[in-house]
């Protein structure tokens, strides 16, 4: 797969997801199974985001762009849910800078995916808004399952990440989008155990 010359936003996200998915399955098959790493097709991501926005409008009289509606992808992978949210047009350009800075959040436990997601999300935001490059402060390198259970294991090494993590724990998050690691949950139910057992 070659990314050069691809201008379609959906196609770019598909390439990122597929390349990362193939790489991870080949390079780290045990980690892929243990953490339940599964990547969601872009079309499914778009459907979920649109559906969430519809429910917000119908049931709560708000949208994904409404001020005060914090959004999180707790298992962000390469950031597909957040990038597609930014690209969806469901958050107007007038609302986007504020949302990006204050009310959009993402967590990832795998270091490589965390860095890819941060770059991916920042680049998509920059492509939409232009101007100076703005870092995505809403992403945390953390295990969402253990966010409230464990002390921050990397606080001394990644001080900024620890600050974002503490801040996120205080938020009133209203919307969760994403694809949780179902394989990890299946392993727990079968009693095979993994890193999450001690936090349950």
Would you name each region that the model predicts?
Residues 2-200:
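SAM-dependent methyltransferase catalytic region
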């Amino acid at each position: 797969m070659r990314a050069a010359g691809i201008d379609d936003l959906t196609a770019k996200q598909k390439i990122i997801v597929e390349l990362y998915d193939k790489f991870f399955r080949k390079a780290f098959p045990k980690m892929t199974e243990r953490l339940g790493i599964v990547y969601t097709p872009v079309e499914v991501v778009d459907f979920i985001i649109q559906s969430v926005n519809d429910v917000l409008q119908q049931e709560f009289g708000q949208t994904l762009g409404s001020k005060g509606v914090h959004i999180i992808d707790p298992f962000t992978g390469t950031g597909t849910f957040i990038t597609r949210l930014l690209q969806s047009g469901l958050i107007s350009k007038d609302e986007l800078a504020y949302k990006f800075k204050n009310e959009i959040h993402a967590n990832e436990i795998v270091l490589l995916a965390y860095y890819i997601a941060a770059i991916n999300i920042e680049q998509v935001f920059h492509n939409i808004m232009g101007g100076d490059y703005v870092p995505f402060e809403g992403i945390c390198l953390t295990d969402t399952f253990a966010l409230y259970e464990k002390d921050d294991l990397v606080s001394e090494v990644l001080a900024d990440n620890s600050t974002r993590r503490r801040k996120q724990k205080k938020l009133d998050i209203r919307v969760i989008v994403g694809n949780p690691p179902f394989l990890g949950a299946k392993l727990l139910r079968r009693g095979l155990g993994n890193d999450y057992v001690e936090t349950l």
